[in-house]
Amino acid sequence: MTNIRKSHPLIKIINHSFIDLPTPSNISSWWNFSSLLGICLILQILTGLFLAMHYTPDTTTAFSSVAHICRDVNYGWMIRYLHANGASMFFICLFIHVGRGLYYGSHTFLETWNIGIILLLTLMATAFMGYVLPWGQMSFWGATVITNLLSAIPYIGTNLVEWIWGGFSVDKATLTRFFAFHFILPFIILALAITHLLFLHETGSNNPSGIPSNTDKIPFHPYYTIKDILGALLLIMVLLTLVLFSPDILGDPDNYIPANPLSTPPHIKPEWYFLFAYAILRSIPNKLGGVLALTFSILILLLIPSLHTSKQRSMMFRPLSQCMFWLLVADLLTLTWIGGQPVEHPFIIIGQLASILYFSLILVLMPLAGIIENSLLKW
C-alpha cells in the first residue's frame, strides 16, 4: 500500500512542496527568510482577523475602537501590537529575502522574480492602507499626503485622487474602502505567494554558488524543516520581545492623537519600512518627478534580470560586485535615516546624493562591475 502523503491528491501536493522536495544541500540561513515570510503572513492574517472583529471603519469611532481593543478586549493589546510589529518583522524578512535574491542571482528565475515584485508592491499597498485604519494624526495626514501624489499625473490626476478619496478630502468613504482593501489584500497576497512557490518549484531552488545542484539534492524534510523551525523560534522571540517590552518603538507618537484635519503634524512621515522610498520622493523638488522616482525606485527591480551582465550567476566569487551590493545596502540604510529627518540642510543634499547613488548603482555601477569581472577572468 502506498503512503497516503504520496497518493492522496491534496496531501501529495503538500508532500512535493514541503516534505520530499529535492533541495540543494548547500543553501545557507539566508534561505530561511522565505519560510519566515510565510509565518509572518499567517500571523498577520490571524491577528488581523481578530482585530477586524472589534474594529469599526468609521471616522467617528475608529480611534475609539482601537483604544477599546487595547483596553477592554481580552489580550487585545497583544493582538494589536503583534499585528503592528508583525508588519515590521514582515518587511525586515522581505528586504533580506529580496537582498538574498539579488546577491545570489535568483533573479534569473524570471517568473518567480516578477511575481515576487508584484508581491512586494501588493504588500506595500496593504501596509499603507493598514496604517490609515487607527485614524490617528499620522494615519490621516499620511493618507492625505500619499494619495495626493496621484494628483501629479497629468490631466486625470485630480479626478483620480477624488475618486480614491470618495469625496473632496480623506474622510469616512476613504476609511471604509481602505478597510475593505486592507482586509481582502492579504488573501490575494497568499494566492500570489502560492504562485510564487509554484514557479520556484518548476525550476528548483538556487544555491549560494549559483551553479546547478541537480547532482547534490537532499529532501526538504527533516533537514530544512528543522533549520526553518530554528529561524521561526528566533523570529517569534524577537517579535515577542518587541511586543512585550517596547511595542511603540517603531511607531509614531503622533498616531496616539486622534485625526484632526485642522492641525498638521510638524513632520509627516510614513512607517519606517517606507522611509527609503519617501526620501527618494522628497529628494526631487518637482512633484511629478518625485512621484516618478518613487515609483521607479521599486519598479527598477523588474529591470535587474536584464541588467545582469556577469557570466557568473551568484556574487559569491565576485568581490567587485559584492562591494557594489554592500554599498547599495548602506545607501538604502542612509535613505531610510534621511526619510525620517526634517526637510532642512544638510539632510536635503544627503538625500539627493543617496538617491542618485541608488539609481546609479543599479543601472550603471553593478552592470559595469559584471563586465569588468568578465574581462578580468578573460571571458
Swiss-Prot record:
Cell compartments where the protein resides: Mitochondrion inner membrane
Coiled-coil parts of chain: none
GO molecular function annotations of the record: metal ion binding; ubiquinol-cytochrome-c reductase activity
Gene3D superfamilies cross-referenced by the UniProt entry: Cytochrome Bc1 Complex, Chain C
Protein name: Cytochrome b
Residues annotated to bind a ubiquinone: 201
Protein family membership: Belongs to the cytochrome b family.
Binding of heme b b562, residues: 83, 182
Any single Gene Ontology cellular-component annotation: respiratory chain complex III
CDD domains: cytochrome_b_C (cd00290), Cytochrome_b_N (cd00284)
Role this protein plays: Component of the ubiquinol-cytochrome c reductase complex (complex III or cytochrome b-c1 complex) that is part of the mitochondrial respiratory chain. The b-c1 complex mediates electron transfer from ubiquinol to cytochrome c. Contributes to the generation of a proton gradient across the mitochondrial membrane that is then used for ATP synthesis.
Main localisation: mitochondrion
Co-factor remark: Binds 2 heme b groups non-covalently.
Cofactor(s), by name: heme b
